[in-house]
Curated annotation (Swiss-Prot):
NCBIfam families assigned: lysS_bact, PRK00484.1
EC number(s) reported in the record: 6.1.1.6
Domain of life: Bacteria
Protein name: Lysine--tRNA ligase
Location of the protein in the cell: Cytoplasm
One GO term (biological process): lysyl-tRNA aminoacylation
Cofactor(s) needed by this chain: Mg(2+)
Keyword terms: Aminoacyl-tRNA synthetase, ATP-binding, Cytoplasm, Ligase, Magnesium, Metal-binding, Nucleotide-binding, Protein biosynthesis
Species of the source: Pelotomaculum thermopropionicum (strain DSM 13744 / JCM 10971 / SI)
Transmembrane segment boundaries: none
Quaternary structure annotation from Swiss-Prot or TrEMBL: Homodimer.
A Pfam family that the UniProt record links to this protein: tRNA_anti-codon
GO cellular component annotations of the record: cytosol
Length: 506
């Protein structure tokens, strides 16, 4: 009777979330751990050989009925009925019910099973049957404790109240929220589909340095580290671009890399300082080829990962089937903001026009024409681009690595892809003129000296590489995390990164 009251107290404590109650429950579980060892039972077992998974049994009942099986998993629920107990155990494929009966396992084992807690991991040997309620179940003949859980699983894990804790303790989130696990399984499918697509197109996957002497390839503030043996500062890469283009100089014609980038910037629903990018380069191609490749790749990935190009994101239906609209940047601004930057060719004129338009956009008097154009676009146009849209022909001031347009040198052969008001991809016809490239780098250096910490640094070795001759090429970067957000209907980038960066608790 005393033992029963103790277990009732344990269940009562488990239902509450107070810290003192949690500590008491953990104390009770540690007592159970000690009891197991006193009985000569090792609560943290070694290798355990299963014959089947939960999903296989559930999907193949006709084949599996009355057959012997050995399964393993975590106890997720339990209900006792005197001389018999039903429980659900969860493995990597799903949950299945087990039936433990006193007459089948014996008094000692049945008493031991009654002392197990939700969260404990066990192995079960038995046979498959279906209950009167129609649930596929494994009737246990024996079981083995594989791992004793000392912390109770939270009962109320859903909802915004627990969202930060879910990110901090993703391991618990994955246990109790199957839909979260599905997101990361889909993420894996998406990345695999990207590789399959590019491999099929003849691209070669490569790896380039994560620590760089000079960070380049993007406008971003880098993380700095120090190499003790060489006594020199290094930068975590903000992009692999300049190294991948060095490979084009070396004779590789189609290369890609899927890897991490690091940018010392703010955190939001769209930004994490550590993120995954797909970047690729193709010799003898241009940004039109990259647009064709982008819409073909993303639609193919959607079909391989989800089975369709029609998805729903945050209540909005989005059709990823190509072709996608291709609209010049200045034209989109003219349509949505009423500003004709094509007729405003100086920064002063552009600045004055934006102020008179009453957009409510804060500009810096030092902003260049291209910077003003981009700020207006991001503020007014970007949120309205819901269906997949290529915005093309960006100002040269904000595109230091893109080739100038022959018919208008103030613009470049560059595009960005927007879906649901978010940038998903960035691409251009690559600048392969070493003299023009050096001149643009020098302008970026001037910006850095003026206080712009995100401006590009001079990379003399990259200029040296271009001087050997780089073939004309198209380049493309796709944010894998944002693509996964889109294809899994996830509102925040933290929902698609297993362990997002979190500020430590005090």
């Amino acid at each position: 009777m005393a033992q029963k009251k103790k277990e009732e107290l344990s269940d009562l404590i488990e239902a509450s979330g107070r810290e003192e109650d949690l500590n008491e429950l953990m104390r009770v579980r540690r007592e159970k751990l000690a009891e197991l060892r006193d009985k000569g039972i090792e609560p943290y077992g070694g290798r355990f050989e299963r014959t089947h998974t939960a999903r296989y049994i559930l999907d193949n009942f006709v084949e599996m009925e009355n057959r012997p099986v050995v399964i393993a998993g975590r106890i997720m629920s339990r209900r006792g009925m005197g001389k018999a107990t039903f429980a659900h155990i969860q493995d990597g494929t799903g949950q299945i019910q087990i039936y433990v009966r006193l007459n089948d396992v014996g008094p000692e084992s049945y008493e031991l099973f009654g002392r197990l807690d939700i969260g404990d991991i066990i192995g079960v040997q038995g046979s498959v049957f279906k209950t009167r309620m129609g649930e596929i179940t494994v009737a246990a003949e024996s079981f083995k404790i594989l791992s004793k859980s000392l912390r109770p699983l939270p009962e109320k894990w859903h909802g915004l109240r627990d969202v930060e804790l879910r990110y901090r303790q993703r391991y618990v989130d994955l246990i109790v929220n199957p839909e979260v696990k599905e997101v990361f399984e889909t993420r894996s499918k998406i990345i695999r589909a990207c590789r399959n697509f590019l491999d099929g197109k003849g691209f070669l996957e490569v790896e380039t340095p994560m620590m760089q002497v000079i960070p380049g390839g993007a406008a971003a503030r880098p993380f700095i580290t120090h190499h003790n043996a060489l006594d020199m500062d290094l930068y975590l890469r903000i992009a692999p671009e300049l190294y991948l283009k060095r490979l084009l100089v070396g004779g590789f014609e189609k290369v890609y890399e899927i890897n991490r980038n690091f940018r010392n910037e703010g955190i939001s629903t769209k930004h994490n300082p550590e993120f995954t990018m797909l970047e690729l380069y193709q010799a003898y191609a241009d940004y039109t080829d990259m647009m064709n490749l982008t819409e073909e790749l993303i639609s193919a990935v959607a079909v391989e990962a989800l089975g369709t190009t029609k998805i729903e994101y945050q209540g909005t239906e989005i059709d990823l089937a190509p072709p996608w609209p291709r609209i010049p940047m200045l034209e989109t601004i003219k349509v949505h903001a009423g500003l004709d930057f094509g007729a405003l060719k100086s920064a002063e004129e552009a600045f004055k026009a934006v102020e008179q338009a009453g957009i409510g956009l804060e500009l810096d008097p030092s902003d260049s024409w291209g910077t003003i154009v981009n700020k207006v676009f991001e503020e007014v146009v970007e949120p309205k681009l819901i269906q997949p849209t290529f915005v093309v022909d960006y100002p040269v001031e904000i595109s230091p690595l893109a080739k100038r347009k022959a018919e208008d040198p103030e613009l470049t052969y560059r595009f960005e892809l927007f879906i649901y008001g978010r940038e998903i991809a960035n691409a251009f016809s690559e600048l392969n003129d070493p003299i023009d490239q050096k001149g643009r780098f020098l302008k970026q250096v001037e910006k850095r000296k003026a206080g712009d910490e995100e401006a590009h640094m001079m990379d003399e070795d990259y200029i040296n590489a271009l001087e050997y001759g780089m073939p004309p090429a198209g380049g493309l970067g796709i944010g894998i995390d944002r693509l996964v957000m889109l294809l899994t209907n996830s509102a925040s980038i933290r929902d698609v990164i297993l362990f997002p960066l979190m500020k430590p608790r005090e």
